[in-house]
Amino acid sequence: MEEGGRDKTPVQSQQPSATAPSGADEKSSGKERRDAGEKDKEQELSEEDKQLQDELEMLVERLGEKDTSLYRPALEELRRQIRSSTTSMTSVPKPLKFLRPHYGKLKEIYENMAPGENKCFAADIISVLAMTMSGERECLKYRLVGSQEELASWGHEYVRHLAGEVAKEWQELDDAEKAQREPLLTLVKEIVPYNMAHNAEHEACDLLMEIEQVDMLEKDIDENAYSKVCLYLTSCVNYVPEPENSALLRCALGVFRKFSRFPEALRLALMLNDMELVEDIFTSCKDVVVQKQMAFMLGRHGVFLELSEDVEEYEDLTEIMSNVQLNSNFLALARELDIMEPKVPDDIYKTHLENNRFGGSGSQVDSARMNLASSFVNGFVNAAFGQDKLLTDDGNKWLYKNKDHGMLSAAASLGMILLWDVDGGLTQIDKYLYSSEDYIKSGALLACGIVNSGVRNECDPALALLSDYVLHNSNTMRLGSIFGLGLAYAGSNREDVLTLLLPVMGDSKSSMEVAGVTALACGMIAVGSCNGDVTSTILQTIMEKSETELKDTYARWLPLGLGLNHLGKGEAIEAILAALEVVSEPFRSFANTLVDVCAYAGSGNVLKVQQLLHICSEHFDSKEKEEDKDKKEKKDKDKKEAPADMGAHQGVAVLGIALIAMGEEIGAEMALRTFGHLLRYGEPTLRRAVPLALALISVSNPRLNILDTLSKFSHDADPEVSYNSIFAMGMVGSGTNNARLAAMLRQLAQYHAKDPNNLFMVRLAQGLTHLGKGTLTLCPYHSDRQLMSQVAVAGLLTVLVSFLDVRNIILGKSHYVLYGLVAAMQPRMLVTFDEELRPLPVSVRVGQAVDVVGQAGKPKTITGFQTHTTPVLLAHGERAELATEEFLPVTPILEGFVILRKNPNYNL
């Protein structure tokens, strides 16, 4: 068939094959075969198609004739044919298909035409045809010399193709070639409105992002498209480098403000961490109800604005931002869920389920370590409920079952039980401030700080109570009061509190532990603010300490304070890293890495993660270890345990990978895979840090693959790996009441029944799993996982960095540092109010959140939902939407406290 077809091919006579060299022979035979194939296809064409093909060929030939009067009608007809060819989206329109072989001829005809209307007309047609050719951006070239008629007339596919070519062309032109960019900009100004009007908002955004002109979006957006455009822009933020990410956020923010969507704009201003902008958005909104909603959002994020007193409803707004009602709203939720009954640690341990060989529970002997564990568990489980069975009735009895530092932590747990209840809580703690035991007094001071965590009070009770003890003769008293102040004023950047604390670091009586805790507290108070006084004081303290002092395990808190001060500030840390160069190794590497990872927390910065992986892959030989026996970073009283030395900064690097990647899901998935490798092949220092990193990447989100990994390493031969893995299990399941995790931990409790340290960790993990009886979360992200609370990250980092030396800090005397988690505790609830802020129960659908970025129409945002009546708990990755049209939410993200308005268009 093919042979016959080839013989009959009319084109053959035109081939110059006789004189061509052999390469051309091959080409010509290929051409023949293709032509033969086309001939076959010709035979398959329907009558209609054949007629169309002949007509188009005749039109092209007419353009090649000398009679110019025929050009215009021929071009008109060609254009009509191309435009009217309605076809499926999956195949090339027929006219374009049939004209494709004549593309070269049409270009020749165009070149030979006299300038004028006809020539422009021909350019338009060639531009459309160029879509089917893989030429050198000829679609754009001929568009620019064409008649400049409306883009829309050629259809969507043409506009999309043109947009792609504009973007490529733009990138090849330098800034100097402005004149050549002008016609491209004119085209863009046509393409963007067309895309906006035809449900292709994301294509318009992509084009403007490619040519770095995102600001042009604002004027083309209408009421219907703005939410989609802004959703697309904000979801691109994770994937573009500085400073483009800020430009995208600012563009979306401008769009929201244009349409008076203040809550959404405020959320983006918080993402930018631009406090002036936050204040500007808040004050420029004249709707009091919306302002109250924004005040709730600021309160949740831990931001407090000093409003002028002439602002309408000043007192209400200040009270909401201060989180004064947080405790009463939380207790209302608890009553609604019927979980007010206090729990005792045994309810959590479920010891009656443990099948010991001797019948009943084997470890009934009261040991100070187990009582300490029970103090923490009791605090975690009854957190914020205001009552328990160990401390609130007759606390002294329980406190004296603990020893020394155990008393401090046990007394402080009272603060956790009374969390956020400033007025009622402080009166209950007050009696312990007069105890004869310094440890109990110190714990009570810490409890005062904990109660005030996240809540502002005009009277400043925490400052009034704790300030007298900051320079107390007893270092024990200093610890409680300083850490208490750090927790009470975390994120406030209050100058008066910092002025009180900073001198403690340089005080001659302060032990290394006190200096470290002071640095930590200052870092928490000034978190993410780059406060100059905090930076200079901590740096000075580091410089003044001798090499031996810097080997103390508590020295790690000094650079952590520095890092927290610059949390999320990116390149602002260059000067600090330079200043740290004078410090001797190994402390220098440790401090540098720690400050560096804090600066990029939650940024998802891939380059930083690569640097950290390089640090993780460094290898320290055993010979070096022998020589460096004197260069120890951690002091370790147990000489059998070889302390970590040069590789200490590697542990920080591992934590850093999690800290940077936790911001976006793809990065977190990739980090997860990396951690698997590190656990198998890494140095001991690395392996000890990996469980902590896994905890950070999945806080309060008990994913099975992570739990299984941690469960495996909770039986590791290296005790520190197993301690950290067990604690990490608690962090991953914190506040979820996850049944599978609870069962795992009960099995571990039996497995480690004879090992007090591991058992202590299991108990802590059990307490965390049932945090606030399953109503609280430690996850630093909120508002649909868009916003990272810096205070929460500071609290988590405080604890995790301390766990890098779990044996000396957590299992030593400094377990009080676990209360750093208080800064991250938040209720995971949705409560709805009416405009007068009265609780308003409405039905809501709660289901798994679905990513709807860039989808056409109005797709469903949740799947697999159940309908509940507010107040309701939201798990990780869940989203809520109203199930009734009677009310409209003031903010689109239903989380935390939401104000609802009556829907004016609602008909009963």
UniProtKB/Swiss-Prot annotation:
Family statement: Belongs to the proteasome subunit S2 family.
GO cellular component: nucleus; proteasome accessory complex; proteasome complex; proteasome regulatory particle; proteasome regulatory particle, base subcomplex; proteasome storage granule
Upper classification of the organism: Eukaryota, Metazoa, Chordata, Craniata, Vertebrata
Sequence positions bearing Phosphotyrosine: Y194
Annotated segments matching region Required for interaction with UBLCP1: 708-903
Molecular function via GO: enzyme regulator activity
Phosphoserine: residues carrying this PTM: S29, S147, S361, S363
Residue ranges, compositional bias (Basic and acidic residues): 24-51, 623-643
Species of origin: Rattus norvegicus
Name of the protein: 26S proteasome non-ATPase regulatory subunit 2
